[in-house]
Amino acid sequence: MRLTLILVTSIMTIVAGCAQPTPQTPPAPSPTSAAVPRAVQPDPQETHFGELVMLTDGGENAEAYFSFAGDRLVYQATKEGMGCDQIFTMKLDGTNQKMVSTGSGRTTCAYYYPGDDWIVYASTHLAGPDCPPVPDHSKGYVWPIYAAYDLFKVRPDGTDLQQLTDSPGYDAEATISPVGDRIVFTSMRDGDLDIYTMNLDGSDVRRLTDALGYDGGPFFSPDGAKIVYRANHPTDPQEIADYSALLADGLIRPSKLEIWIMNADGSDKRQITDLGAASFAPFFMPSGDRIIFSSNTGDPSGREFDLYTIGIDGEGLERITYSPEFDGFPMFAPDGTTFVFCSNRSNSTPGDTNVFLTRWID
């Protein structure tokens, strides 16, 4: 789900097979965008970061995830002239940015396959070429759950597009186990927003969660044995009624999300944060015994999102970033030290979200 852009804007807004569209060339950088990456110094309190390298500058760029070889990133972006997100790849120096999605509809949540010969992502393009409508914010701060989202895989050059899911309702938020055997994703195929796994070809779908409420944003642990995710399970009758009414309209209210973990087969579910805030984008640290995630827990206004780490036992919460705006979508490369995240810091245009690379310092 495309969280960053909705956060930033709000904070300060049946086919048997797929014909292969011709990949489009992304728009050229605007004159105000940096043509090459640039160094940015972290805040003095950000002691886990070496020098930051800003890989993008201009538009909205987020959810950047490493290839299995650790030499490329796949990410989603709304660049100049685009109405909504498409999927791009780039080298770790920010060069060779190429669009790999169709250029139609809205896309989200891309991830490399083992061997880096495929990329999985969600797209609405089968429902039409236009961007789907943004949420009606008269209902408050809400996220859209686009029923037109299905999962696809594509070659890194944008060819050989293949559909993986074809169920009624939302299928998105897919990532792949480091072991290379299963895709984990969020789906509404059974009437609620739950987490499922499947084989890399879309077969053998298994449901992992069944509690009322939203379960999503899943990632595997380094050994593939566990899954970390974000969740909101309403229990109060009014909260349940509100959740059900919004979901019927294709919306959810994400003001309170906690971080959970479970075994890769769905057993032993445990809540590991209790912050009463919007906590999301969890990712396992290389050791496998801590989680890094984004949350607005440190800001009474709920507008500033920073990165935090916490033990899988729920102990040892540590704040990592101190930017006054948005920091989110953290991920470690396979080498365990190269680190990527997305932020509003140091941008050329206020509110833009960009991709940053750094070396993690323990």
Model-derived segments and spans:
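Multi-bladed beta-propeller domains
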Residues: 39-60, 91-106, 154-170, 199-214, ...
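Beta-strand-rich domains and repeat architectures in extracellular enzymes and scaffolds
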Residues: 37-42, 51-83
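Hydrophobic beta-strand positions that form the internal "hydrophobic ladder"
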Residues: 73-74, 119, 183, 227, ...
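C-terminal motif of bacterial Sec signal peptides marking the signal peptidase cleavage site
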Residues: 15-17
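Residue-level detector of Asp-centered blade-edge/turn motifs that repeat once per structural unit
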Residues: 68-69, 114-115, 178-179, 222-223, ...
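A flexible loop/linker signature enriched in serine peptidases of the S9 family
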Residues: 57-60, 77-87, 101-107, 122-150, ...
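Bacterial Sec signal peptide processing site at the extreme N-terminus
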Residues: 19-32
